[in-house]
Amino acid sequence: MFKNINIFEARKEGYKTYRVPGITVTKNDVVLVTAEARPNEGSDWDSNDVILRRSLDAGKTFQNRQIVANHSDFGKGPISNFVLIPDLTTGKIIAVFCWKYSRVFRMFSENDGETFSEPEEIASTFEQFLKDYNWRVCATGPGHGIQLQSGRMIIPVWLSDGTGNEMGEGNLGHRPSVVSSIHSDDCGISWERGEIICRHGDDINGETLINPSETIAVQQNNGTILFNIRSESLIDRRLIAHSPDGATNWNIQGFDDALLEPVCMASILKSNYNNEQNLKEILFVNPDNLENDLIPTGRNLRHDRKLSLIHISEPTRRTT
């Protein structure tokens, strides 16, 4: 059923490692795969670029890589958290990403990711958050955003006040943190902020929420928006929240017992195919693991990032 294809290979072409992958499919069925290309030690704060590879045959083969966001075009500091959204009406591809975890840009492609427009900053969108949270670090996604049936585009975001010291001397910390969203109703031209959904220290059904961050989104069959949230909470489960529009009136369902949290990026999407109940199944994938016997000395990780597993949910949950 599954076939492994090595799209990005570590320690080649000038980069030590590739992190934070993203994948999307255009209106014309071109597969776009992105990753942060990290030199040096491969850390969040290295001189990271974002590279892209395209497939014209449903992922069987991929064209040569292209650098779609080069840190040297911006200055010192990493490019990160690259998010793609295809507009399935016009075919335009919208890309949103961060530089130095403090400035956010968007750009467009009208040829299925072959080329992109010049980046334009969307600073005013994130300035709106300062009314509720004095952030110094911001990040979009990562992975991919979503487009609703109404045409609205939604990207989860996380913000930090930067007071943590876990990123080393001279770098702002990524903790403590909060989670929110941004949305666009004009095909990615302008963006507005959503409500803050949850904050570090919140009480979630008796469990303390610790450093919520990378969040993934999906529109459920009933039209509501589900956010699946990474955190460092000691319960080691993914946090689930719902909203009618992806921006307001968030309801935090709680931690999902079925979805382990190794403190790592995950992905979620809705299938294009209807099941026997005429509903589209939702697929969730992450490292389904709480062991910690492979972590190298000195790495600040709680669990090994291994054993990727696909969970299928709707109308009943089951795991494959």
Where are these regions (language model features)?
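Single conserved hydrophobic/aromatic residue that forms the stacking wall/gate
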Residues: 310-320
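Entry beta-strands of beta-propeller and related beta-repeat scaffolds
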Residues: 29-33, 90-95, 151-156, 223-226, ...
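Beta-propeller and closely related beta-sheet repeat lectin domains
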Residues: 19-22, 78-83, 141-144, 213-216, ...
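Blade-loop segments of beta-propeller domains
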Residues: 46-92
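Asp-box/WD-like beta-propeller blade repeats and closely related beta-sheet repeat scaffolds
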Residues: 79-83, 96-147
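Short, conserved, GDST-rich strand-edge loop motifs in beta-rich repeat architectures
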Residues: 36-45, 158-174, 287-302
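Loop/turn-rich, solvent-exposed surfaces of beta-rich toroidal or solenoidal domains
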Residues: 238, 257-309
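Beta-propeller blade signature
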Residues: 49-58, 106-112, 177-187, 240-245, ...
